[in-house]
């Protein structure tokens, strides 16, 4: 079995939590890491820890996304792993939602994913090699009250990933969508005392991403659901 080998990873929507865990894991595997976010000041410590480079980018702006890939190529190289970890939310009672805020939330979760994935695919297809990974959520498969914009964006993102997987997988590009069905533990967000183990460990999630990246072509996963063992579903 031939295990895919990767050299450069780009994580879009980078911040603390899962993005940081992915950056650390990729760096430990000898993969060079690029981090993209609207505000990169928050990424300084992670860059120093992992040797990653940070790039400012609004993922909903087509020109900025194209420039992002150009800068990453010039400064690091062409990414053969691209993770889309950005999402937008606009919470509220359905009849009170502000249309402009809803449009922005959907743009971040779905349209930004399209823009980033399109630039990634253009560069991966000539080599018939690469992986494009999308971070989904419980809202990717079920809508919750007062969370319609998040559900719309995540449902659309999942549809994008599924369509891409069916089109690009036969051309050598591994497209995978991860349904993160539960809250992710962080320094600012921990399990309540009466519900131990009720949140996902970001390092454990990152390991699942890595396991998917290591799959031989004869047995690729397109979608994976991850949740704590105590989570009801």
Residue spans of the language-model regions?
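Rossmann-fold cofactor-recognition segment
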Residues: 49-63
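C-terminal helical subdomain
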Residues: 170-185, 191-233
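Catalytic Tyr-X3-Lys loop
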Residues: 88, 95-114, 133, 157
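Catalytic loop of short-chain dehydrogenase/reductase
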Residues: 131-156, 162, 166-169, 184
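Conserved glycine-rich Rossmann-like NAD(P)H-binding loop of the short-chain dehydrogenase/reductase
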Residues: 29-45
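Active-site loop of short-chain dehydrogenase/reductase
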Residues: 6-7, 78-79, 93, 124-137, ...
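A short, exposed helix-loop element centered on a Lys and neighboring polar residues
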Residues: 117-118, 162
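Conserved glycine-rich cofactor-binding loop
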Residues: 15-16
């Amino acid at each position: 079995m031939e295990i895919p080998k990767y050299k450069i990873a780009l994580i879009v929507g980078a911040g603390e939590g899962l993005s940081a865990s992915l950056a650390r894991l990729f760096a430990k595997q000898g993969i060079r890491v690029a981090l993209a976010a609207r505000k990169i000041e928050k990424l300084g410590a992670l860059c120093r820890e992992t040797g990653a480079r940070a790039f400012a980018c609004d993922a909903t702006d087509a020109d900025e996304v194209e420039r992002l890939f150009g800068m990453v190529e010039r400064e690091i190289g062409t990414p053969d792993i691209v993770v889309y970890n950005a999402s937008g939310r606009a919470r509220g009672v359905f009849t009170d939602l502000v249309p402009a805020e809803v449009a922005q939330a959907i743009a971040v979760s779905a349209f930004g994913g399209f823009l980033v994935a399109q630039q990634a695919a253009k560069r991966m297809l000539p080599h018939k090699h690469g992986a494009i990974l999308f971070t989904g959520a419980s809202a990717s498969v079920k809508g919750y009250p007062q969370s319609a914009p998040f559900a719309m964006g995540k449902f659309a993102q999942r549809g994008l990933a599924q369509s891409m997987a069916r089109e690009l997988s036969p051309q050598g590009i591994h497209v995978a969508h991860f349904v993160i069905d539960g809250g992710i533990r962080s320094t600012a967000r921990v399990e309540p005392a009466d519900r131990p183990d009720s949140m996902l460990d970001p390092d454990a999630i990152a390991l699942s991403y890595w396991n998917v990246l290591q799959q031989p072509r004869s047995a690729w996963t397109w979608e994976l659901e991850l949740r704590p063992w105590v989570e009801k579903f």
